[in-house]
């Protein structure tokens, strides 16, 4: 059973995939989106679901530090609901607080340049989100 992890931003969606045993997450790609034009990357996500035989999707839910859900969190919830309807798959929301900061720290500790970090940060945040989900199931 493979699980897809998504870090949904305003301009990109970071994508990670689990191994078949559901133990580890690895980064796949970053999908460019344009919310204003209604381009959310659903076609590419659908392709990845088919390609990797995905059974479940985990979408990062950006909560405020006090646990409340703001406008960005509401947008992610709507994104997840649209995916659920489109793909007819189990879509789970996962608290992603500080996932981007954790990904940034991982990349800095690996001595990745600032330019390269900017290119892969969303994909790495998706890895952090998915690995957190896998570790707790």
Curated annotation (Swiss-Prot):
It comes from the Bacteria. Belongs to the YqgF nuclease family. Could be a nuclease involved in processing of the 5'-end of pre-16S rRNA. One of its GO terms (cellular component) is cytoplasm. Pfam families: RuvX. GO terms for molecular function: nuclease activity. Its main location: cytoplasm. Keywords: Cytoplasm, Hydrolase, Nuclease, Ribosome biogenesis. It is found in: Cytoplasm. One of its GO terms (biological process) is rRNA 5'-end processing. This is Putative pre-16S rRNA nuclease. The lineage of its organism: Bacteria, Bacillati, Bacillota, Bacilli, Bacillales. Its EC number is 3.1.-.-.
């Amino acid at each position: 059973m493979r699980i897809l992890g998504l870090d949904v931003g305003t301009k990109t969606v970071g994508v990670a995939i689990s191994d078949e045993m559901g133990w580890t997450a690895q980064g796949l790609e970053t999908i460019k989106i344009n919310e204003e034009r209604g381009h959310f990357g659903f076609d590419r996500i659908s392709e990845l679901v088919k390609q990797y035989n995905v059974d479940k999707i985990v979408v990062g839910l950006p909560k405020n530090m006090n646990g409340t859900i703001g406008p960005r969190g509401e947008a992610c919830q709507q994104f997840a609901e649209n995916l659920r309807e489109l793909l007819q798959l189990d879509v789970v929301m996962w608290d992603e607080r500080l996932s981007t900061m954790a990904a940034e720290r991982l990349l800095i500790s690996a001595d990745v340049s600032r330019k390269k970090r900017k290119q892969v940060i969303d994909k790495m945040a998706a890895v952090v989100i998915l690995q957190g989900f896998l570790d707790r199931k």
